[in-house]
Amino acid sequence: MVEVVTYANKSFGMFEDLINNDFGVKVKVLGWGTKWHGFSDKSKGLLKYLQNKRDKDIIVFVDGFDTKINKSIENVAKMFKQCECKVLLSRDPQVMGKHITNHIFGTCTSAHVGNAGMFMGYAKELKLMMKDAISMGCKDDQINLNRLCGKYDFIKVDENDLIFKNFGPRDKETSTNAVFVSFPGNMNIKRWSRAIPEYAQFFYLHILLVNILLLAALPKRTKPLLLSLALITVYYIIFADRSCTIKT
């Protein structure tokens, strides 16, 4: 049995196309009408949904706003079993570049970052992972999933994009034979304002070090600005979210 599940509290982006897809695939919507508190909402919603599922039920989770069902899902279970794993993550497109993406999220395998926007697995193992993800201090679900790859040997990444394909904003070619396809969302001011404080926690020491070096090297007339930047960085270190960089 294969079920497709998403988490969406409203209709936005590609949501209507996902629900009213061309292949008659029923998509279970979690979280509808609720207030969004953060990425952990998805893990909590999925865990609650999984409680009534049989261990061997196969659940496909997709992003509600960016995902398209590209073809029939009739062979998905067979394709998944051929991967010889219990949980399969989609491959991240590394929009921010390989080094920055790896620095923030870590890698699931030696070469690939798993993407939390699309993944699938058996209900038993997904329940185990969602419980762990919720208990982790980090507020970012993708970071948590990649860290869990180091804990469990039953997780793999769809390295060849056979079931899942994530396109990046710079991809000119968007044709694929994958079953589930994710297209980049609009990088508007709201998304940037959310992303900067979430991911700046991985770079604040780098920024502070650069400010200190520039304060020592550049002319006096530029130092007030650099000093201000350094003070802002220190303020961030003290008060801002560092849930993913401090071990609990």
Predicted feature locations:
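Short beta-strand-to-loop acidic/aromatic patch adjacent to the donor-nucleotide binding site
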Residues: 57-65
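Short coil/turn segments at beta-strand junctions that form active-site/ligand-binding loops
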Residues: 55-58, 85, 153
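N-terminal anchoring/stem segment of glycosyltransferases
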Residues: 1-58, 210-247
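Acidic, Ser/Thr-rich intrinsically disordered and amphipathic helical segments
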Residues: 14-17, 45, 75, 125-128, ...
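Catalytic core and acceptor-binding pocket of nucleotide-sugar-dependent glycosyltransferases
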Residues: 111-207
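A conserved hydrophobic position in a structured secondary element of the catalytic/binding core
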Residues: 64, 71, 121
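Conserved donor-nucleotide/metal-binding helix-loop-beta segment in metal-dependent transferases, i.e.
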Residues: 67-108
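A generic structural motif
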Residues: 27-36, 89-93, 157-163
